[in-house]
Amino acid sequence: MKEFIIKANKTVTNGEINLKDLPGSSGRLDLICRCVNSAFFLSHDLRRDTIFYSVLYGPPNPPIALQFVGNELKRVSPDERSIALFIKKALEKDASELWKESTSGIYSSKWEFRDIILKKKNEGKRIFYLHLNGKPLENFEFKNDEDFVFILGDHIGIGEEDEEFLEEIGAEKISLSPLELHADHCIILVHNILDKLK
């Protein structure tokens, strides 16, 4: 199982989304939509072995955590507008500590970024923090019988406090490239590496 968790610092936390201006009025919701696309969409199928989380910290009601479960997703198209519509529907639900399903395979809750990561850590999953200044990918060994969790930041990053938190819990800091990459491109690169283990 592959899981991705991204912290979205400015993305709105209600359903008032302007589908014509995802980057501006919705706090870079376009970036999250592209990450969903990269996490799941193949040429003629979906990745069923993947779960994607985005924890939104924009106004007016942060945090809102969104969960996309690959083996449950239905009717989602790969374009940003379609994905944004499904996110809009999820954000229109009243979020609580319990995960609530808005459409097949898409859930929302009031879980915090750190709480989701701690849950994965307690489940015994291997936690990686994708960062430009991490150790080169070539220095890590991946086994196809392991469960992996990859932490990403948006265009702002995750912030110093959350970086310290990841260090405290023993997350492995990994770099995919000597260049700074978009989060959605990082997801594709991770998939490519792990696909080769099969």
UniProtKB/Swiss-Prot annotation:
UniProt KW keywords: Cytoplasm, Methyltransferase, S-adenosyl-L-methionine, Transferase, tRNA processing
Catalytic activity, as annotated: pseudouridine(54) in tRNA + S-adenosyl-L-methionine = N(1)-methylpseudouridine(54) in tRNA + S-adenosyl-L-homocysteine + H(+)
Presence of keyword Iron: no
Places the protein is found: Cytoplasm
GO biological process: tRNA methylation
Pfam families: Methyltrn_RNA_2
EC number: 2.1.1.257
Keyword Metal-binding: no
Amino acids binding S-adenosyl-L-methionine: 130, 153, 176-181, 186
Coiled-coil positions: none
Enzyme class: transferase
InterPro entries: Alpha/beta_knot_MTases (IPR029028), TrmY (IPR007158), tRNA_m1G_MTases_N (IPR029026)
Any one GO cellular component localisation term in the record: cytoplasm
Cleavable signal peptide: none
GO molecular function: S-adenosylmethionine-dependent methyltransferase activity; tRNA methyltransferase activity
Family: Belongs to the methyltransferase superfamily. TrmY family.
Subunit structure: Homodimer.
PANTHER family: TRNA (PSEUDOURIDINE(54)-N(1))-METHYLTRANSFERASE (PTHR40703:SF1)
Purpose: Specifically catalyzes the N1-methylation of pseudouridine at position 54 (Psi54) in tRNAs.
The protein's name: tRNA (pseudouridine(54)-N(1))-methyltransferase
Organism the protein comes from: Methanococcus maripaludis (strain C5 / ATCC BAA-1333)
Upper lineage: Archaea, Methanobacteriati, Methanobacteriota, Methanomada group, Methanococci
Encoding gene, per UniProt annotation: trmY
